[in-house]
Amino acid sequence: MRDTQSPGPDQRRDVPATRCASTVTPMLVLDGRHFDGVSETALLTLHQRATEAARPDGIIDDPIAIMLRDRIDYDYHHFGRTHQATAWRALGFDIASREYLDVHPRATVVALAEGLQTSFWRLDNGELSWLSVDLAPIVRLREQLLPTSTRLRTCARSALDYSWMDLVDSANGVLVTAEGLFQYLQPASVFDLIAACAKRFAGGRLVFDSVPKFLSRYSQRRGLKLSKQYTAPPMPFWFTAKQYDQLRAIDGIEAVWELPAPPGRGRVIGSAARLMYRLPQLSGLRAPTTIVEFS
């Protein structure tokens, strides 16, 4: 983990404050060009989600994402064209999370490598507790720019530093989310982390997404170029529903299933997604959102 200094006077400017459901610090705009240790993928996914949320026909309601994006002065066009895929993934995580929170409303949600996600404000039921785990630069940025809550804590550690588990109150249930994380890890690290969660959080759940084999291989061999200026990082871990037996073999895992496709925007996209999820022979081509239940 690399530490960064707080932005200097030349990196921020005061603008009028805005009101949110939670307490908000005075409105600042930070210069994203000077961030050190903040992954560009965090800015990319924020931009994609906020752009979708700002559409009149957007598939996700995320005003905090729009606010956060606007508080970071950055050339988002650097990432190329926007699309709904990132918001579609977030919508799937919201659906899976709400299913668990409907039964365990006071559960602790642990968001691993949360980046600049804003899931807490979309899911907050007034009772849950939230632990945001990420490296120090991201944690500092979140604390500077996002609303606060007495039920929202941060932990400046890697998801692979299992000491974050000591901060989790499991009395009312635990939901661990890994949104946009596992594909950037080595396979052994992913399975070790899942096994550690299963051992530690009996009765809890894990939700994660992954990419299919062809996309992983392409990203490593040729690079996934999203624009002339930006190429996505390599994704060494791939995983589809065809590999679920590997998870079922881990001690402490009760059940594994794939989240059905959430609704997308547009007739063509919606029809293609339904077809992709309806045909078993296409399971190896999907980028699934997987739910793991711990015994």
What are these language model-derived features?
Residues 217-234:
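Short, glycine-/aromatic-enriched active-site segment of Class I SAM-dependent methyltransferases
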Residues 162-171:
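Short amphipathic alpha-helix with an adjacent loop that forms part of the alpha/beta core around
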Residues 2, 13-110, 114-157, 170:
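Rossmann-like AdoMet
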Residues 235-260:
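Short alpha-helix
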Residues 200-213:
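Conserved beta-strand signature within the Rossmann-like core of class I S-adenosyl-L-methionine
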Residues 176-177:
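A conserved beta-strand element that flanks and buttresses the S-adenosyl-L-methionine
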Residues 251-278:
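Conserved catalytic loop of SAM-dependent methyltransferase domains
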Residues 184-196:
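A short, conserved alpha-helix within the catalytic core of class I
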